[in-house]
């Protein structure tokens, strides 16, 4: 008997849909009449308000949440660096994942892990018992999940958990109570001896919880399955300050020194926080909430050499300064699939996937192990109505009036919540036209 963990297609599908909201006809007509620079001038007051909100959002975390944020940051960069190393075999492969959802799922599993299995999970997640107790970590995740799922919050970030257990298996009451208390995880009996019907029920559950975004989370189920762990993350962000779709045009993007692809390049003149040094240039794009996207553009050909650290990311954030920028960035849609079983083994979390696994904190009735763990995340950065707008075939030409910020080569993307103090998503965009 084994534990089947579907951290796939929905611990799995982290949908970060970044859409530009259309103006009503009256405002949109006036916006287009006034032109690019005039509209940017009128938008500066809104930009300034957004910059003030950024300052207000930061620094509201509790001591425990700040420590958890640091640990999640360490885990995030470790996982990113491991995935980046693995991707060198496919230099045009994009990377995208949700570190906080992976952390939540494995901390939840840690509630039922014991001995070396338990220690490996905590160490792999960068847990430091000298700074925080394990119970404090679970409490911090409890607050994070409650906050993220609060319908009164401006952000649209939702974490959900569910455990589907073979109806003949006795799950320890303490474990069931803990996952409900800390991770809002529902525990549901399931007849996995009828895998087709079980698959249908699981997919319907996820379809309902994700408002139809995910139609088919699970394609196959083994009749020997004893438990399925579902961890899903949904995120939808709207730019705090919109791009004008009529300014989008076709432009070239350099995948490497020898390869160019054609992309749809958006353009906006406005106030942004930016930073530049000899290695890269960075810009922060705020959403209509407490989150922001950070784009890091290394020199062409240098992205594969970049090794992230928490210290380096903190340096970037602390160095950001506000200025008027003429921004050119591509629309893109990428997905990233991570075979966690292979990647986490390389990061020290290995026993849980073998017969050495000790998950007797979940059930003492049978010997459990994690037989499958994968993670899919999808990011869409686009404009409303782009397909309906006739795009001209021309190279982007930044204005000379303000400093241009042109994103036309591979870049890193991070989506960060200031009030949650966490990296929600991380990725590397090598080719914006490669959706896989």
Swiss-Prot record:
Residues 32-60 have a biased composition (Basic and acidic residues). The keyword Signal applies. Residues 26-60 are annotated as: Disordered. PROSITE patterns: SERPIN. Liver. Its main location: secreted. InterPro entries: Serpin_CS, Serpin_dom, Serpin_fam, Serpin_sf, Serpin_sf_1, Serpin_sf_2. Residues 1-16 form the signal peptide. Keywords: Glycoprotein, Secreted, Signal. Pfam families: Serpin. Glycans are attached at residues 260, 289. Induction: By estrogen. It is found in: Secreted, Extracellular space. GO terms for cellular component: extracellular space. One of its GO terms (molecular function) is serine-type endopeptidase inhibitor activity. PANTHER family: SERINE PROTEASE INHIBITOR A6, SERINE PROTEASE INHIBITOR, SERPIN. Not yet known. Belongs to the serpin family. This is Serine protease inhibitor A6. It comes from Xenopus laevis.
């Amino acid at each position: 008997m084994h534990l089947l963990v579907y951290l796939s297609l929905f611990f799995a599908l982290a949908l970060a849909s970044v859409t530009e909201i259309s103006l009503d006809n009256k405002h949109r007509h006036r916006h287009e009449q006034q032109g690019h620079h005039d509209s940017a001038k009128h938008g500066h007051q809104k930009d300034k308000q957004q910059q003030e909100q950024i300052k207000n959002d930061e620094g509201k975390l509790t001591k425990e949440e700040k420590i958890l944020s640091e640990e999640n940051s360490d885990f995030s960069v470790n996982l990113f660096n491991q995935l980046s190393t693995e991707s060198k075999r496919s230099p045009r492969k994009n990377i995208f994942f949700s570190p906080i959802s992976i952390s939540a799922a494995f901390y939840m599993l840690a509630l039922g892990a014991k001995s070396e299995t338990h220690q490996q999970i905590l160490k792999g997640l960068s847990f430091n018992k000298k700074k925080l107790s394990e119970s404090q970590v679970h409490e911090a995740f409890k607050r994070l999940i409650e906050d993220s799922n609060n319908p009164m919050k401006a952000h649209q970030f939702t974490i959900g958990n569910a455990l589907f257990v073979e109806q003949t298996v006795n799950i320890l009451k303490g474990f069931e109570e803990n996952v409900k208390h800390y991770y809002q995880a529902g525990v549901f009996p399931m007849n996995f001896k009828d895998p087709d019907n079980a698959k249908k029920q699981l997919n319907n559950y996820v379809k309902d919880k994700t408002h139809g975004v995910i139609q088919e989370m699970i394609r196959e189920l083994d009749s020997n399955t004893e438990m399925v762990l579902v961890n899903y993350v949904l995120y939808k962000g709207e730019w705090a300050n919109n791009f004008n779709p009529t300014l989008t045009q076709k432009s070239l993007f350099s995948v490497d020194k020898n390869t160019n692809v054609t992309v749809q390049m958006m353009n906006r003149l406005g106030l942004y926080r930016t930073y530049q040094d000899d290695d890269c240039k960075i810009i922060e794009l705020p959403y209509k909430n407490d989150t922001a996207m950070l784009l890091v553009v290394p020199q062409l050909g240098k992205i594969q050499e970049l090794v992230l650290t928490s210290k380096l990311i903190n340096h970037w954030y602390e160095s950001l300064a506000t200025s008027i920028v003429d921004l050119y960035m591509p629309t893109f849609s990428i997905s990233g699939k991570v075979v966690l079983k292979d990647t986490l083994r390389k990061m020290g979390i290995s026993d849980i996937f073998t017969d050495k696994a000790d998950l007797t904190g979940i059930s003492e009735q049978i010997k459990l192990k994690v037989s499958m763990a994968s993670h899919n995340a999808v990011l869409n950065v686009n404009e409303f109505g782009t397909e309906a707008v006739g795009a001209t075939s021309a190279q982007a030409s930044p204005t000379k009036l303000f400093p241009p910020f042109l994103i036309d080569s591979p870049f890193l993307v991070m989506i960060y919540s200031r009030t949650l103090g966490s990296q929600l998503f991380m990725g590397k965009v090598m080719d914006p036209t490669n959706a896989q």
